[in-house]
A protein has these predicted regions:
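Non-catalytic propeptide/linker segments at domain boundaries
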Residues: 1-39, 76, 237-258
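Functional beta-strand-loop-alpha-helix junction segments that form "active/interaction loops"
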Residues: 74-85, 261-311
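Short beta-strand-plus-loop segments that form exposed binding edges in beta-rich domains
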Residues: 223-234
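Short beta-strands within extracellular/lumenal beta-sheet-rich domains
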Residues: 133-159
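A short beta-strand element within beta-rich, extracytoplasmic domains
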Residues: 151-175
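Conserved small/polar residues in nucleotide/adenosyl-binding loops
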Residues: 326
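Short, surface-exposed beta-strand/strand-loop-strand elements in extracellular ectodomains
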Residues: 173-192
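Extracellular carbohydrate recognition and processing domains
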Residues: 188-217
Length: 326
């Protein structure tokens, strides 16, 4: 699987175990090119709009139900309702902390490919944050007795408020990437371990889970990537994101002013490093049509090169089903 929660107390033996499913809630706030303003795709009705109403089913119920049945779920729209967003990255010094520790046999080094860097707060059409920075890599080692001489990277965020935050990691898929990169998420509920297949899905945000964190900067609120692996190769480290955040894509010289989860998929796709033709087939002239196509284009690009979509170039994620609530 792309992502596996090793700390899960039960192992799903049937059902959707290790199945990869794409789910989206459709619509979302978008830029109306003809009116030069942001707005909803559907009319207001009974004190809501379809752009908001479908999310009230998909985010708290449908996606968790599928995940509890064993599935790995991807959504092309932002899934986290947290308005705050903190990114910890080797390229972007801030109040948060990024730390590397090597071992006797393995040292961190710069990878030969581009990585994520947040060099601005507002992005224009076509700008890709996953092409603006660098990423790090280190050779893997077998598990050691008594956990001595371990190599790892740490991302320690300085969070503006106590609350629940989605945790997204990122990396680049390298020629000798491993399928069992070990991530540990330290949060208020303890420590949760994940194995991430870095052979697929490089160059975008990879969702691990949503956790409770305290305000500020502390050693029980962080993400750790170890170089421990059962395979001979490398693990890659890039930015880690805490929280869904606010929309930061400018259209017509203005941003939506809304949390990212309320925006359409077109803008989440750009922030997630998707190629321009995935989210802007109309070359920035029709965001409504682009948003409709972005949802499926993102899934096709993610699954490109996998057994389910072998002829299209992409990130190799074996997404075998798409489900949407319209």
């Amino acid at each position: 699987p792309w992502v596996k929660n090793i700390s899960r107390p039960n192992e799903v033996s049937r059902g959707l175990q290790d199945r990869h499913i794409a789910v989206w809630q459709s619509h979302g706030n978008y830029f109306k090119n003809d009116k030069n303003e942001w707005g909803w795709q559907r009319p207001r009705l009974f004190c809501t709009t379809e752009d908001l109403f479908t999310q009230s089913f998909v985010l708290p119920y449908v996606i968790p139900m599928l995940e509890n049945a064993g599935a790995v779920v991807y959504t092309p729209r932002e899934r986290d309702t947290q308005k705050n967003e903190i990114i910890v990255d080797n390229d972007t010094p801030n109040a948060s902390l990024y730390l590397e520790v090597g071992s006797k046999k393995a040292k961190w080094d710069r990878a030969s490919v581009r990585g994520f860097a947040q060099k601005k707060t507002i992005y224009q059409d076509g700008e890709n944050p996953f092409a603006d920075g660098t990423c790090r890599m280190i050779s893997t080692e077998r598990k050691k007795k008594k956990n001595k001489d371990q190599a790892f990277a740490e991302w320690v965020p300085t969070l503006p408020a106590t609350g629940t935050y989605a945790v997204y990691v990122s990396y680049q898929t390298l020629p000798n990437s491993v399928s069992d990169a070990k991530y540990l998420v330290f949060h208020n509920g303890g420590v949760t371990e994940f194995k991430v297949n870095q052979k697929i899905g490089g160059g975008t945000w990879v969702y691990l889970g949503t956790f409770e964190f305290d305000k500020g900067n502390n050693d029980y609120g962080m993400v750790v990537l170890s170089n421990e692996s059962s395979e001979h190769g490398v693990v890659c480290a890039d930015a880690v994101r805490f929280g869904g955040g606010m929309g930061n894509i400018s259209r017509g010289g203005k941003i939506s002013g809304l949390p990212r989860y309320l925006e359409g998929a077109r803008y989440s796709a750009q922030w997630a490093g998707m190629p321009y033709d995935v989210y802007a087939g109309r070359k920035g002239e029709n965001d409504y049509a682009d948003d409709i196509n972005t949802r499926s284009n993102t899934i096709n690009y993610l699954s490109g090169g996998s057994v389910y979509n072998p002829t299209q170039p992409g990130l190799g994620v074996p997404l075998e089903m798409t489900c949407l609530l319209y």
